[in-house]
From Swiss-Prot:
SUPFAM superfamilies: PLP-dependent transferases (SSF53383). One of its GO terms (molecular function) is pyridoxal phosphate binding. NCBIfam families: hisC. It is an enzyme of class 2 (transferase). Keywords: Amino-acid biosynthesis, Aminotransferase, Histidine biosynthesis, Pyridoxal phosphate, Transferase. The modification N6-(pyridoxal phosphate)lysine is found at K226. Pathway: Amino-acid biosynthesis; L-histidine biosynthesis; L-histidine from 5-phospho-alpha-D-ribose 1-diphosphate: step 7/9. It holds the Pfam family Aminotran_1_2. This is Histidinol-phosphate aminotransferase. Its EC number is 2.6.1.9. InterPro entries: Aminotransferase_I/II_large, HisP_aminotrans, HistidinolP_aminotransfase, PyrdxlP-dep_Trfase, PyrdxlP-dep_Trfase_major, PyrdxlP-dep_Trfase_small. It comes from Campylobacter jejuni subsp. doylei (strain ATCC BAA-1458 / RM4099 / 269.97). The lineage of its organism: Bacteria, Pseudomonadati, Campylobacterota, Epsilonproteobacteria, Campylobacterales. One of its GO terms (biological process) is L-histidine biosynthetic process.
């Protein structure tokens, strides 16, 4: 059977390995997953109780207006319901953005190394990709590439903070950059990890209500997968002016998010105790990873996320990843990004100590 030609130029996204599969493959009793930037404390207890109470409604289609969650988000961000679209993860909203703006005759712009799904989705449309020479977000390079190819570029991705590297630009820098972008070019700010950045440094905080008030061409993305511990329910959102949201709705299938996910997201948003514990743990445990890197002279980029990336010169990241797997520790090897590096999710104190103990043995 023949398939569309563009599929020959696509590669699969590589997700973090599954705990049960690793336990079976390597014969390890206890497996710790520090690969997919999931919340180390799991799902909030209030959200779990909500899921229990609504499990008997799993046979029902959700409220397609999603008014309850939209209203909660609108109140949080001081915006209107018409400024919000809910997706099966923020990934789906990325897909809406790409399919609404890109085709084989135009292009998009991104950092040298960033979230892989931007390019995967864009290649489905045949769009050309311009990347900065720097692997991190260098706005001077973004400006130069945009000015050179502005007639082609119809979409710009800013992953703030950046996955898989962790760096983050100051909000003021981002706003100044957007001022130089034509209003017909959509600027996507992927803020999946922005709560972690804002907790660490208020200068990194981006306020979506201010962004969409000042710019008609900005899309702000948020997710419930990281801070709120709902990764398995696949739910995220986009915030933009009403015209953008209206266009996206033409691409959205009905009932794209389950009723259980919608209910749990509303409850999780209101669990301040859980999010506070998550942010405080992440900040304190991140310091230990920095100290470990310093001990072994491992290169890092200052991370504003819930993960840290270790770069290596002589040691091979694939070998290191395999040795950790044999010890029952799953991390993310970044060879697929062209980097000799590993990305480690900040876990609980117990999980992190396990990592330090085993990685210490490997590096000696």
């Amino acid at each position: 059977m023949k398939f569309n030609e563009f599929l020959n130029h696509l590669s699969n996204y590589e997700p973090g390995k599954d705990i049960e599969l690793i336990a079976k493959e390597y014969g390890v009793k206890e497996v710790i997953k520090l690969a997919s930037n999931e919340n180390p404390f799991g799902t909030p207890s209030k959200a779990i109780e909500c899921l229990r109470q609504n499990a008997n409604k799993a046979h029902l289609y959700p409220d397609d207006s999603m008014v309850e969650l939209k209203s909660a988000l609108a109140q949080k961000y001081k915006i209107q319901n018409e400024n919000i679209i809910i997706g099966a993860g923020s990934d789906q909203v990325i897909e809406f953005a790409i399919h609404s703006k890109l085709n084989s005759k135009n292009a998009f712009l991104q950092a040298g190394v960033t979230f892989a799904m931007y390019e995967i989705y864009a290649k489905q449309c045949g769009a050309k990709c311009y990347k900065t020479q720097s692997i991190t977000h260098n706005l001077d390079e973004f400006k130069k590439l945009y000015e050179t190819h502005k007639d082609e570029i119809k979409l710009i991705f800013l992953c703030l903070p950046n996955n898989p590297l962790g760096e983050c630009l100051d909000a003021s820098e981002v706003i100044e950059f957007i001022k130089g972008v034509h209003k017909d070019c959509l600027v996507v700010i992927d803020a999946a990890y922005n709560e972690f950045a804002s907790f660490k440094d208020s200068k990194k905080h981006l306020e979506p209500c201010e962004l969409i008030k000042e710019f008609e061409n900005v899309l702000y993305l948020g997710t419930f997968s990281k801070l709120y511990g709902l990764g398995g329910l696949r739910i995220g959102y986009g915030i933009a002016n009403a015209n953008i949201i209206s266009a996206f709705y033409k691409l959205r299938a009905p009932f794209n998010v389950s009723n259980l996910a919608l209910k749990a997201a509303v409850v999780a948003m209101d669990d301040d105790e859980f999010t506070k514990k998550t942010l405080e743990n992440n900040f304190s445990q991140m310091q230990l990873y920095k100290e470990f890197a310093k001990k072994y002279d491992i290169k890092i980029i200052d991370s504003y996320t819930n993960f840290i990336t270790y770069f290596f010169d002589e040691k091979n990241s694939t070998d290191l990843s395999e040795k950790l797997l044999k010890k029952g520790i799953i991390i993310r090897n970044l060879k697929s990004y062209g980097l000799n590096a590993i990305r480690i999710t900040i876990g609980t104190s117990y999980e992190n100590e396990r990592f330090f103990t085993e990685f210490d043995k490997i590096l000696r």
